[in-house]
């Protein structure tokens, strides 16, 4: 039979088990408000029974506290991370689209926008000149309204550039945050393994790691996996340590056990710009070990994807075409040195590439992908040619940079391959709205100036342009020579170089009034014939018709004055979608977090009940000790020998 002191050992184990449960409850209560803390519980099991060689076989030996485990459901963690990733993406989009709405807003009293300014120019100002074309005051006022229109677009371009800079800076901030979190998780992995190799559970460290994963999932989409490390000499024996891996961006490893990979932001140089309207210094992201990090991967997710799509979104209107020819061209640089460069001609079929007014290719050079090879290019030219049947064909010829930028020569095997510049991003981000403004100012200025050029001013001289564009450096203005007007071409072939004096050089940022017109309002053409008197204003009627007839000057199927309506519809739709998805995913993430908190969170009422339960258990174990004390007293002191 078991020893008479066997019961004392059972009571002792009961005291230990109840004490462990009480201490765990104390810890839970203390951390009820601690962010990321998971409720813990003492896992107990019956001690191995002892064989006593009696009819009842075995005698129970009490209870053992096996471990203190955290209560956590990884299924809800993963669901939360997925929802949090979408929440992060639309959080960024709704923030920036709200700004965009504010910029395009038109409030005639507090914040005059396009419609107010355009109506003053096209209705009030134009009507005054039509009524009194000989008056210098009315013409000066009209030119002033035109200048207000150019100032509006200058300001809008500046606002969008600021937005692009903010998004770019925030991308860098998020990359630094990823690096910080990944380094901390790698350190935690090491600390967790050090503790768990001894057989204990690193509950608090695991909670800290999960909290960091919550933060990381908002920045980018993540996947995790954890599996035990086994003894190399005995694969069936687990060492107690685990290998924890985090992957982002379509499966690229960010953290592997104790090691973390770091990302770096590299500013694009002037010759690496993608869009004509891009600000300098936009960041590309790479791994510090030299491997590529695709910032445009659709699986990127989170705040990063929202920021990238806002910064670079072009509504899938990037440059693309098919290589039709390669060649050579002699190019003379700024120092007068002539050198032969490779060229590649790319035929385009998309409507937005056929019209140079819609083109957003960088005028500082860039990178072009030909098949699976990437080349730097210095310049490009646009060609429109008509065949014998009068059918037009459109192509772009790129002058490839020399060996200082390219580590390979262009070969003829690229012919027939796909060519592209930049990425096609399925979102209407800042480049899209910049391109929309550029298209409008180019098309409107072109039509407006054409009418003025066909008439005569107060001096009887041929009409001048009203709208111009400033050079970036020397303070001069573009003249927009008709020799580069491909839209007036009916046959043959015309080539427009990116440096030529074409309307492609005009952007919302450099849009301006002809300086000479500001100095002398009488240069404004108002009549169709030089012999007509100063009161003649028939030319201005053509301008009025042009601004109100979408067949004479159309923008996306609307009249010139409906520009804001077209663009604002895009902004409103994107802002509405962003707000809707932001609220939806915020609610979904909150709902999932509530579900997982119901499992892993601390409930004060439940812990209060546990306190009473474990206290009773402790009291009963103490009662066992007291009872056994009385038994031993009778057995040892009062039993006669």
Where are these regions (language model features)?
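Structural signature of extracellular appendage/secretion-system components
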Residues: 1-641
């Amino acid at each position: 039979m078991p020893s008479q002191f066997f019961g004392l050992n059972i009571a002792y184990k009961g005291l230990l088990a109840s004490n462990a449960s009480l201490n765990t409850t104390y810890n839970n209560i203390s951390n009820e408000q601690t962010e990321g803390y998971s409720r813990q519980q003492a896992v107990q099991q019956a001690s191995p029974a002892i064989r006593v060689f009696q009819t009842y076989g075995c005698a129970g030996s009490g209870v053992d506290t096996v471990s203190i485990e955290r209560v956590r459901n990884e299924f809800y963690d993963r669901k939360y991370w997925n929802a949090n990733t979408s929440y992060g993406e639309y959080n960024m989009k709704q923030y920036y689209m709200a700004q965009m709405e504010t910029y395009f807003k038109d409030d005639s009293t507090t914040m005059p926008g396009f419609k107010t300014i355009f109506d003053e120019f096209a209705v009030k100002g134009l009507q005054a000149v039509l009524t009194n074309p000989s008056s210098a005051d009315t013409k000066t006022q009209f030119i002033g309204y035109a200048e207000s229109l150019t100032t509006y677009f200058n300001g809008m371009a500046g606002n969008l550039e600021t937005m692009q800079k903010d998004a770019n800076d925030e991308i860098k901030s998020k990359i630094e945050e990823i690096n910080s979190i990944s380094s901390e998780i790698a350190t935690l992995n090491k600390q967790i393994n050090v503790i768990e190799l001894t057989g204990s559970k690193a509950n608090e460290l695991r909670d800290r790691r999960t909290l960091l994963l919550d933060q990381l999932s908002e920045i980018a989409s993540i996947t995790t996996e954890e599996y035990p490390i086994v003894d190399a000499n005995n694969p069936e024996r687990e060492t107690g340590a685990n290998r924890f891996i985090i992957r982002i961006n379509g499966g690229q490893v960010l953290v592997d056990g104790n090691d973390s990979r770091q990302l770096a932001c590299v500013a694009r140089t002037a010759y690496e710009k993608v869009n004509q309207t891009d600000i300098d210094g936009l960041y590309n992201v790479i791994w510090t070990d030299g491997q590529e990090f695709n910032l445009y991967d659709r699986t990127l997710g989170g705040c990063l994807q929202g920021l990238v799509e806002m910064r670079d979104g072009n509504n899938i209107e990037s440059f693309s075409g098919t290589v039709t020819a390669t060649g050579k061209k002699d190019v003379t640089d700024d120092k007068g040195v002539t050198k032969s460069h490779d060229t590649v001609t790319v035929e385009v079929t998309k409507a937005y590439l056929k019209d140079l007014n819609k083109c957003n290719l960088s005028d500082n050079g860039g990178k072009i992908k030909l098949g699976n090879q990437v080349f730097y290019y210095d310049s490009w030219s646009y060609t429109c040619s008509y065949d014998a049947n009068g059918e037009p064909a459109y192509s772009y010829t790129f002058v490839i940079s020399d060996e200082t930028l390219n580590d390979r020569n262009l070969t003829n095997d690229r012919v027939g391959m796909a060519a592209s510049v930049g990425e096609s991003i399925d979102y209407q981000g800042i480049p899209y709205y910049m391109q929309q403004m550029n298209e409008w100012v180019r098309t409107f200025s072109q039509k407006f100036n054409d009418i003025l050029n066909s008439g005569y001013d107060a001096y009887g001289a041929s009409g001048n342009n009203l709208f111009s564009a400033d050079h970036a450096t020397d303070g001069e203005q573009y003249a927009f020579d008709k020799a580069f007007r491909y839209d007036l071409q009916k046959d043959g072939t015309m080539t427009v170089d990116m440096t030529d004096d074409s309307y492609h050089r005009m952007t919302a940022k450099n849009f301006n009034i002809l300086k000479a017109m500001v100095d002398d309002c009488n240069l404004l053409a108002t009549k169709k014939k030089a012999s007509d008197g100063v009161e003649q204003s028939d030319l201005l009627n053509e301008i009025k018709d042009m601004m109100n007839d979408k067949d004479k000057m159309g923008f996306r199927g609307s009249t010139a004055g409906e520009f804001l309506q077209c663009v604002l519809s895009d902004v409103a739709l994107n802002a509405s979608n962003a707000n809707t998805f932001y609220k939806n995913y915020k609610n979904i993430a909150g709902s999932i977090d509530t579900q997982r908190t119901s499992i892993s969170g601390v409930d004060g009422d439940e812990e209060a009940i546990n306190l009473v339960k474990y206290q009773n258990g402790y009291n009963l174990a103490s009662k066992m000790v007291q009872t056994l004390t009385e038994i031993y007293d009778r057995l040892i002191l009062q039993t006669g020998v």
